[in-house]
């Protein structure tokens, strides 16, 4: 409960500058509701007047028509201002999330499941819309109209006001609270399974080409279907509770209307109120449940919204693995030195490296070999300052790596991952990554060196040809050479190749390795689990059991 109150308080603080707009939404909601209740009550009143021999007042009918039109306008105003706040805040949340991710990367994306992040950016942020558009205004509206209605019923009878108060309280407070506690564990389980399924689906989508080549796509589809059915079962459990809640809400309304009508009948029989007033109060009561039903439906939507808020604030509160506390800039990286370095990943106790002493020098191709998971890539991620060491010292030239500006350091290093990263952009944009100082002549010069110039120029629009991971116009070997082009265009001091040939045949492996040897100037790190891949390196190190030694 305390956790939920903190979340709600924090969400309100996040949009406090928009509270006047929320008040506008409440204003339109309250007056729209009062008009909704007033119209049938006025029609009943006019009907009784006609039955008692009175004349139908045309002016009253005109007023009713105006009120009916106004009801539509008030309804529009309520939704417009409520959703204006919601979508404005959602945009702010997304900006905050992307800004935070920029501060957390690359370590965050290195350790975070992409499916979970996509779910957070898309589905979780969308779920917050329920809080901003369908929680604050309805709660305030419900509170105001309940006070107005209770005072109205009290004008006729204490018993009627007590019945109304009881029914409204059950609908707006008791039912939401009871079902909120029941829904919470189901929603948490549902979130976990949806996150897992999203990740599994994305992995399947990205690896579809490999699945087709291996002929195991049918088995993968079966697993996807199985996972989907599990998610659907969890969804059904939530839906059942939601249906049960609706049933209790309408059962409460049914008993409430019956009790109200019975008391009305007794009061008429005792001549404490007139038949006309009894019918009007019953009509008002029967048409007054909309805001309270909206509140009774909150547990599901609000439960999801609060769950989403937890995930969102968890990310926004996350500390960066590496702060950008350094302000030094290295002119050129000539030497990398590790002295008594201990390292473990954030929030993990197991040491990956212990008392590591190591020295890498400029203008050498360094081979790093070892079993999968031995720490080869981790060693390079420490050099790139994705993570900081637990203890010891890492120096670039004579400067402590902690004193060097992280972004400036990473500008000096070109990292080529195992799997080529292709963005849904033109070939030029994929290669330059926003660097407008790189000319087309430079791109084509490097393309010729990497034996890709003819292939690029033969595409539909040359460098302006749009490519993406789905529209494959390059082979695996050519995609790896595109990555190499991207690295060479960066003109870095250090090149890190992480298993660059693990997915290539012998011919393409030979092409890539020769291109690396011929074109990469400066310090080159070649990570592989195969000795044959690093055989041409100037020096080879083996990473094993938390140590790195020359072989």
Residues of each region from the PLM?
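Membrane-integrated ABC transporters
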Residues: 1-36, 52-60, 78-82, 86, ...
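Juxtamembrane helix-loop junctions of ABC transporter transmembrane domains
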Residues: 4, 32, 36-48, 67-114, ...
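An intracellular "coupling" helix at the cytosolic face of ABC transporter transmembrane type-1 domains
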Residues: 14-16, 106-107, 123-132, 136, ...
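Transmembrane helices of ABC transporter permease
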Residues: 17, 21-34, 67, 134-189, ...
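Hydrophobic alpha-helical segments in the permease module
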Residues: 60-75, 168-171, 242-258, 275-300
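ABC ATPase nucleotide-binding domain helical subdomain, centered on the C-loop/LSGGQ "ABC signature"
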Residues: 95, 314, 395, 403, ...
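Cytosolic ends of transmembrane helices, especially the final helix of ABC transmembrane type-1 domains
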Residues: 213-216, 240, 288-317
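Helix-to-loop junction immediately C-terminal to a conserved catalytic motif
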Residues: 384
